[in-house]
């Protein structure tokens, strides 16, 4: 359940209270079990928010496939989301729910449109995130559902950190080249989410960084190029790579044109995002 670590931790610094100058960064951190409806109701009602940004999720995709984990994954991604949506309805506040391209079947080459309803999740994670989406859209009118992909940021585990660590200890690495998408930098995403909740332009959106669609192989090559690594990157197919318990989408292309159409600023190029991110990692090390 790492969603709040990866994205939520970048939200507070991004938000300074546009309406009244009140800094969210001064608000206390409260640990909350979103699977407990009574606790969710009490904690959120005590705050009386104008908007709730729901980042918490079970994101361990392969572990979610374990028979003894499925109920827990569903309790978090679907049940917890329903609890939050119910409180938002009672309080008449906005809700923003972060979701994923995994709600689709991951096939083809055409970018997925935000308002596409051709849902065919490939795995338990995708199915439960879809159930979370439906909980929000069927409960509320004032909601944003924002799908993202290939997330990386300062906190939590992510692909960039993993490949940097692997590159330090291996002369060569094998990376899949037939899964296509675009990375999302949490620092950039947080600023977009703030803009969204200050608006009333509700609905479904896709939000990844700009710069076109790439493979994990392409991403790794750029990570090593910018980091100055000499590690050789070998492209392989998903079938050749193997190992994954949960099915992965080949097509994670998300169409983001609705953002601009509704007046939102697109996220910067992913290569620029990666450059800034690597710079921050060095500064913090």
Question: Could you say what each language-model-derived stretch is?
Answer:
Residues 1-51:
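N-terminal Rossmann/SDR dinucleotide-binding element
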Residues 71, 75-80, 90, 103-146, ...:
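Catalytic helix-loop patch of NAD(P)-dependent Rossmann-fold dehydrogenases
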Residues 250-285:
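C-terminal amphipathic/interface module of NAD(P)-dependent oxidoreductases
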Residues 192, 199-244, 250-251, 270, ...:
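Mid/C-terminal beta-alpha module of Rossmann-like enzyme folds, strongest
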Residues 34-76:
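NAD(P)H-binding glycine-rich loop region in Rossmannoid oxidoreductase-like domains
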Residues 134-181, 187-188, 195:
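NAD(P)-dependent short-chain dehydrogenase/reductase
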Residues 9, 52-56, 95-100, 105, ...:
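SDR active-site strand-loop-helix element
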Residues 37, 81-84, 133, 193:
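Conserved internal alpha-helix within the Rossmann fold of NAD(P)-dependent oxidoreductases
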